[in-house]
């Protein structure tokens, strides 16, 4: 009797079971889009190449492998050195796996059969990668659709599939990229379940960090605790990006944590902490930022800046719904920040006039948020016809699209006191006239506050995926060990 067990990925214990049907549905969605494209010939085949193992420079020390995202989206394969082919007309899938030498069994473990991979990944056929040219020749596709296109966040070109003998086939490398990117923009219900999981585990890890942080600790101790929780409780071997664990003036460094500033400052009494960290499960990302006082109690100035950012974050989320233009949400956050900084007394004058001279970008030079999925800055932000807005702040926005159901984005407003941006503003008469320099001086070494939530656009609003303490009262209670269990808010 045939097995009724549906293939799934899980790392055991309490980790999420991800059905391989998720990837079968993705392949189906891609084929349906391609068949509607008038430029796609009958008999076309999609060819994707997975990631390769990499070594550290010239050594034989392997870097932990993580699958290439487009290949993972279509096949969910965790092994390196694979290819995938999808028949566009029928939707049938073929996975090509490496033919491993006998010595592999000595050093790396059991060599699995093709049937093993067919069952593991629920594909229609499995062949060896060194036979891809001969297998495709026997199938005689009219054209091979390969992946080539620019990532609008990095400016890098994705790797196009290549194998010995590909020159014998007719190849088109322009059709596939925009179609598969657009598929990735809109998440299925199964994909959303994984993103809910990555957010739940990462949110729990952030709460553990809040409870553990103490004056005198190193920033990297909090990074270590976050990673340990995500891996031990959630099976997350990877983080979605380099952990950003800022304290004090470092909280004004937007992408702190790099090799030259490796989360190595000692946390001091009176510091604000800004911790931007997200765990990754089965290549699905999360991206969460929490800001809180190192000693567990907000000062008046910390509370004022924090609640300004919280107001902008919550106003944006309550305004989000299908049809909303994302740059308008960035401008809304800017307006609220300037209103609040005026209320605090740091600025004075007309907020409309401040917006005219782009004063908001002095305090929030980055974009309000970005797509999230298999990459932390997920693809699809600027498809053909969507132009980047060349204005301070907005030019850093990673998408300028109108919101649609199924899109997953971060909402991450922030207010930062970045010396060189403040100095530039004070040297510009059009901006300097709004500053109360005596009050500004009080905030010069403040750092900054960012609040980052992950949300999915629904038919009527949005669903909040992140569940961490957010109000001043919730944060102080959590840091005192008196927090209560939180849950995502659900659709709005």
Swiss-Prot record:
Residues that hold Mn(2+) 2 according to the record: 287, 370, 412, 452
Stretches of the chain forming a coiled coil according to its record: none
PROSITE patterns found in the cross-reference section: PROLINE_PEPTIDASE
Residues where N-acetylalanine is found: 2
Enzyme class, first EC level, given as a word: hydrolase
Record's keyword terms, sorted: Acetylation, Collagen degradation, Dipeptidase, Hydrolase, Manganese, Metal-binding, Metalloprotease, Phosphoprotein, Protease
Its biological purpose: Dipeptidase that catalyzes the hydrolysis of dipeptides with a prolyl (Xaa-Pro) or hydroxyprolyl residue in the C-terminal position. The preferred dipeptide substrate is Gly-Pro, but other Xaa-Pro dipeptides, such as Ala-Pro, Met-Pro, Phe-Pro, Val-Pro and Leu-Pro, can be cleaved. Plays an important role in collagen metabolism because the high level of iminoacids in collagen.
Protein name: Xaa-Pro dipeptidase
